[in-house]
C-alpha cells in the first residue's frame, strides 16, 4: 500500500495557459485503475471545454472559486462543491476570480480520453452576443474583462 507524498510529485504545465496539474494517483503510483489528478487554475485562466467520451469524471473544488461551464451553462462553484460529468458531457472551467482555484479530477480508469470541443452557440463563459459584450465572439474578448 503506497503512501504518496504530494511534495514529491512533479507538476505538469500545458493542460491550459495558467493551469498546472499533478497526478496524485495513477498507474505510476501503483493504482490498478483509479486516476486522480490535482489541477491548479490561476486567476483569469481557464480549462477549455472538453468531453470524456467513454468515462465519467468527478471534479471536486478543493480551494477557491471558479465557474463551471457545463454544456451551454455557466455555474459558479466553490470549495467543497463537486461536479459529476457523465461520459460524453461537455465541461470546462473558468477562473474569473481574485485567487487561484484547486480541483481534483477523479476518473475510474487510467485510460482517460479527452476531446476538446466547441459547442455551436455556447460561449467560453462570456456573453458572446455583439451589443451585450461589445464583441462578436468569446475569443475576441480579453479574459480580464467583465468581472
For each of these PLM feature ranges, what is it?
Residues 72-87:
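Short acidic-glycine-tyrosine-enriched beta hairpin
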Residues 22, 37-52:
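Conserved short histidine dyad/triad with adjacent acidic residue
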Residues 38-39, 58, 84, 98-114:
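A short hydrophobic beta-strand segment most commonly corresponding to one strand
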Residues 54-66:
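Glycine- and acidic-residue-biased ligand/ion/polar-headgroup-sensing regions
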Residues 48-49, 68-69, 85, 91-98:
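Short beta-strand His + acidic residue motifs that chelate non-heme Fe in jelly-roll/DSBH
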Residues 1-33, 48, 114, 118-147:
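A short, N-terminal "cap"/entry segment at the start of jelly-roll beta-barrel domains
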Amino acid at each position: 500500500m503506497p503512501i504518496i507524498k504530494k511534495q514529491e510529485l512533479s507538476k505538469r504545465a500545458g493542460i491550459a495557459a495558467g493551469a498546472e496539474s499533478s497526478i496524485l494517483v495513477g498507474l505510476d503510483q501503483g493504482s490498478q485503475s483509479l486516476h486522480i489528478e490535482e489541477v491548479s487554475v490561476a486567476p483569469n485562466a481557464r480549462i477549455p471545454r472538453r468531453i470524456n467520451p467513454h468515462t465519467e469524471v468527478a471534479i471536486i473544488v478543493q480551494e477557491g472559486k471558479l465557474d463551471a461551464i457545463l454544456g451551454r451553462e455557466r455555474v459558479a462553484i466553490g470549495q467543497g462543491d463537486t461536479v459529476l460529468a457523465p461520459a460524453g458531457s461537455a465541461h470546462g472551467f473558468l477562473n474569473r476570480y481574485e485567487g487561484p482555484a484547486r480541483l481534483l479530477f477523479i476518473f475510474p480508469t487510467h485510460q482517460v480520453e479527452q476531446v476538446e470541443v466547441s459547442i455551436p452557440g455556447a460561449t467560453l463563459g462570456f456573453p458572446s452576443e455583439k451589443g451585450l459584450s461589445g464583441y462578436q465572439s468569446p475569443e475576441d474578448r480579453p479574459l480580464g474583462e467583465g468581472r
